[in-house]
Amino acid sequence: MYNLPRDLPEEVLCRIPLTSLRPVRSTCKKWSTLSKCGSFAKKHLAQAKVLADAKEFMVVLMMNFRVYLMRVNLQNNVVESSSSSSSSSSSCIKREAKLISLGDEEADISQVFHCDGLLLCISITESKTRLVVWNPYWGHTRLFEPTHQFNKFDSYSYALGYDKSRKSHKILRGITCLDPFKIYDFNSDLWRDLDVTPEWHLWQMLHGVSLKGNAYWFARENYTETMDTDHFFLLCFDFTSETFGPPLPLPFEFAVSEDTMSVSSVREEQLVVLYQPWDYLQLDIWVTSKIEPNAVSWNSKVFLSVSLKQLVSPQFQLTFGSFFIDEEKKVAVVFDKDYDNKRNIAYIFGVDGSFKAVDLGDSDRKCFPLVCSYVPSLVQLN
């Protein structure tokens, strides 16, 4: 290895899957140095993108309070499944590696938020809360002092975003409507209060999503005695102006808090929403045609509409329905639990009516799986 021309080992290492990069770095000091070189990293990520475009892509999955990198292969609209204990290479969803180690195997990860190839992880133990921003590609982490000590099952919202004018990442924190929103600037290394008096509150039971450096959540109007129904909408936080945008309409009406709603993104270009009414076993997914902090429009045709009663169970109701879609292959993958809440399941729906369920193993009853897209990044954490 030491006598080989530099470009030869670089060419070989470029073909290593992203999921195997960490053990390769620990094998040889020279390989580790080479893999952390900027020119190599650009070639490696370009090679990974070619592979992703060709047949498979990666997502980050939080499951049982741990974070994993999942490899997904949905070739030719043919979905083959295997149990998590199977070593079969035909499985369309594979748990490649546990992603994060905080130096404490007892530390549970209760929330994950992805932005620009960075992961914001909220880690909670009985004695402390930790905020960690992590770049999985470099293996770099940055710890932040939290402003509040949480219980694992508290309701709160965090988001990671990007200030385009200052080229700086920021963290937004919200707890309840009675607590002020706080924002953390990576450059100043300080938390500060935001001057916001909302006429709404974030629906904190539902996870938000990052798109183009901004964050989006489901929200609803503050309760008043004259309200006869819930009014849900999308809400954007612009990390550049540090302001919330106006309520953005959803493609469905009359949602209530018992319904299942989830938001995702596709190709870092558009938002996607999932909706299942609590009293009707119909699952619908829509994709935006335009999305900005102050405006949204939806494709006139629903991306996917299926009957869970026919495909899954006569009485099946998704709980959180964290998901992603593949527009080209016309497939949606929804992560949730089984009917008894004992197993983690990936439900794979095709727009043509096809269906498969991939068993991901035993489930911690108090932790629902959460999936987000993952695109490797060369961003350095200072």
Swiss-Prot record:
Signal sequence residues: none
Limits of the F-box domain: 1-44
Segments passing through the bilayer: none
InterPro entries reported in the protein's UniProt record: A_thaliana_F-box, F-box-assoc_dom_typ1, F-box-assoc_interact_dom, F-box-like_dom_sf, F-box_dom
Pfam family, any one: FBA_1
Superkingdom of the source species: Eukaryota
Name of the molecule in the record: F-box protein At3g19470
Upper lineage: Eukaryota, Viridiplantae, Streptophyta, Embryophyta, Tracheophyta
